UniProtKB/Swiss-Prot annotation:
Family affiliation: Belongs to the ATG7 family.
Keywords: Autophagy, Cytoplasm, Protein transport, Transport, Ubl conjugation pathway
Domain of life of the native organism: Eukaryota
Alphabetical list of InterPro entries matching this protein: Atg7 (IPR006285), Atg7_N (IPR032197), Atg7_N_1 (IPR042522), Atg7_N_2 (IPR042523), ThiF/MoeB/HesA (IPR045886), ThiF_NAD_FAD-bd (IPR000594), Ubiquitin-activating_enz (IPR035985)
GO biological process: autophagosome assembly; autophagy of mitochondrion; cellular response to nitrogen starvation; piecemeal microautophagy of the nucleus; protein modification by small protein conjugation; protein transport
Catalytic residue list: C485 (glycyl thioester intermediate)
Domain note: The GxGxxG motif is important for the function, possibly through binding with ATP.
Motif mapping: GXGXXG motif: 313-318
Compartment annotation: Cytoplasm; Preautophagosomal structure
Single GO cellular component term: phagophore assembly site
Protein name per UniProt: Ubiquitin-like modifier-activating enzyme ATG7
PANTHER family: UBIQUITIN-ACTIVATING ENZYME E1 (PTHR10953), UBIQUITIN-LIKE MODIFIER-ACTIVATING ENZYME ATG7 (PTHR10953:SF3)
């Protein structure tokens, strides 16, 4: 009596954590909302099978068709759903039946190698780092067919060695020569050679059913001989008879059982295996990269991420600007300030708490930013920015402060001017123009604010000082308490800070089609709850952007700065403002003289 041919499970999956990391990256950056099947590849190590069946390994390189050339490569695909509901509602029986039918058709058309393939269905919860997946390798046979073993025999080691060197898991023998198991050769071949996925004695892998179904439909014969090659001494050849109808409906199976031995999906929770800092990094990037899925596919997030921001003034504006930059994924933020945290600061300045009172502001702000996001590169510098019109009192210290400021501006990409005093902004404005940096200015009134980007040589737009006909001078001496403190409606700083950062982000984009056009100035008025966009040209006699001023600073450095601190009039003289003032005074005198002449003539 003949024995029915039995089969072992076709495979056992091993999904490395690197596969999920790569799937996450591709889903976020490449696939996005595209839920079409994507090709996978698995390198089968048929020479080192430690369990009863081959291990189907999936790693980060499984998305790359170029795998280890010495290994047998099996093709597959992954269908990653956009929602967990879609994953759960997928008809798994229908899915594998359709895949089995496709494999049969591919086998009949292209040969036995094309009738074996694996499939992964998955859902990646990118926020929780949890992955749901199910792997299958469809095996099929016609419903009315069965397979009987007529005889078996061992295979000589020499023959096995010659065949094993072939870099394919399936081939056939025609007139004593090994050939590809294509339909052309399957019609006339004497036997098929299969590098078996199973190590159970006398029991081949279930994909043998695929080979027999395809082969028996291509070539009608009484028996079919298959050589099952293995790396141990259990290789054997079997003569098999296919009985019953071989053209009816397909019976398809092949879903892998989970760890409990049930036909159900598996899951992998990587959150406990990951460094919390890495999780924070990826979570920040996740929220931003989701913008590219539908809303802003062309947004340049890398430029925002890699830009180096220098925040001059670590008060209310500075704190909110830093938080907004962090939310946009910026990784490099430097603070500069000359004061310490006062008891009134923590309620208005979100990077400080009560324990920070008395600490240098820049240092405390930097430390707080690193507590919020440990991967940020941040530093705090306590220094006084030399102010035009404020005479030099300690030259060695002020010169050192100038040199540090100059180096900071030179090594950063964008400079935020967020200081209280107008004259504090003059030197950074000149240095920013000299080093050709992006300069963003924000200033507050009681219920109004100004946000602007300084112009450059290309756009001919004005800077913060381009509307002035006098250079800034000492405005801090002899001021009352309400003039020394920033008296403003608390919400104004948030509005100005957020618009300053959004202005920068918009300006950094490659075109106006991404986030719109970047205005030159934004003026907000909270008493009317409105904003106005303005654009003003550069003023040739501006005390900060005038070419003579910039060239003099470039050539003379500290010596010119010292001169400007002691006497702001020298800047007016250099920029041409003095002449403008003289002409204006002369015009006024002429108007007065004209009015006097008219009065005399009337009398």
């Amino acid at each position: 009596m003949l024995n029915d041919l039995k089969f072992s499970p076709a495979f056992k999956s091993f999904v490395d954590t690197s596969f999920f990391h790569e799937l996450s990256r591709l889903k976020l950056e490449v696939f996005k909302l595209d839920s079409a099947e994507k090709e996978l590849f698995s390198a089968l190590d048929l020479e080192n099978i430690t369990s009863n069946t081959v291990s189907l390994s999936l790693r980060d390189d499984s998305f790359d068709p170029v795998l280890n050339n010495e290994a047998v490569t099996l093709k597959g695909s992954v269908l990653n759903f956009n929602t967990i509901e879609s994953f759960k509602s997928c008809d798994k029986v229908k899915f594998i039946k359709e895949k089995g039918q496709q494999l049969l058709e591919q086998g009949l058309k292209n040969g036995l190698k094309e009738c074996v393939r694996f499939y992964v269905i998955s859902f990646a919860d990118l926020k929780k780092y949890k992955f749901y997946y199910w792997v299958c390798m469809p095996t099929f046979q016609s419903e009315g067919s069965s397979y009987e073993i007529i005889s078996t025999k061992s295979i000589e080691d020499g023959v096995k060695k010659d065949i094993w060197e072939q870099n394919s898991f399936i081939s056939c023998v025609v007139d004593g020569k090994i050939q590809e198991a294509s339909p052309q050769y399957l019609k006339v071949c004497q036997k098929v050679i299969f590098k078996d996925f199973s190590r159970l004695k006398g029991i081949p892998a279930a994909v043998t059913k695929n080979f027999l179904t395809v082969w028996s439909q291509i070539s009608t014969r009484n028996t079919y001989t298959i050589c099952f090659l293995r790396d141990d001494n259990s290789s054997f050849a079997a003569e098999i008879r296919v009985t019953g109808s071989n053209t009816g409906c397909l019976k398809v199976s092949g879903w892998e059982k989970n760890g409990l031995g049930k036909l159900a999906p598996k899951s992998a929770d990587l959150s406990s295996l990951m460094d919390p800092v890495k999780i924070a990094e990826q979570s920040i990037d996740l929220n931003l990269k989701l913008m590219k899925w539908r809303i802003a596919p062309d947004i340049d997030l890398e430029r925002i991420k890699n830009i180096k921001a220098l925040i001059l003034g670590s008060g209310t504006l500075g704190c909110y600007v830093a938080r907004a930059l962090l939310a946009w994924g910026t990784r490099h933020v430097t603070f500069v300030d000359n004061s310490t945290v006062s008891f009134s600061n923590p309620v208005r300045q979100p990077l400080f708490n009560f324990e920070d009172c008395g600490r240098p502001k820049a240092e405390a702000a930097s430390d707080s930013l690193k507590k919020i996001f440990p991967s940020v590169v941040s530093a705090g510098y306590q220094l006084e920015i030399p102010m035009i019109g404020h005479p030099v009192s300690n030259e060695s210290k002020q010169r050192k402060d100038y040199e540090i400021l100059d180096e900071l501006i030179r090594t950063h990409d964008v400079i935020f001017l967020l200081m209280d005093a107008r004259e504090t902004r003059w030197l950074p404005s000149v240095l920013g123009r000299m080093h050709e940096k992006i300069v963003i200015n924000a200033a507050l009134g009681f219920d109004s604010y100004l946000v602007m980007r300084h112009g450059n040589n290309n756009d001919n737009l004005g800077c913060y000082f381009c509307n002035d006909i006098v250079a800034p001078s000492d405005s801090l001496t002899d001021r009352t308490l309400d003039q020394m403190c920033t008296v403003t409606r608390p919400g104004v700083a948030l509005l100005a800070a957020s618009q300053a950062v959004e202005l920068l982000v918009t300006y950094l984009q490659p075109s106006t089609n991404v986030l719109g056009s970047a205005p030159h100035q934004i003026r907000g008025f909270l008493n009317e709850f409105k904003t106005v966009k303005l654009e003003t040209p550069a003023y040739q006699h501006c005390c900060a952007s005038n070419e003579n001023v910039i060239l003099t600073l470039k050539e003379n450095g500290w010596n010119f700065v010292k001169q400007a601190l002691d006497d702001y009039k020298c800047v007016e003289q250099l920029s041409g403002l003095s002449k403008v003032q003289e002409e204006a005074e002369l015009a006024i005198q002429e108007d007065i003289s004209f009015d006097d002449d008219e009065e005399l003539s009337i009398e």
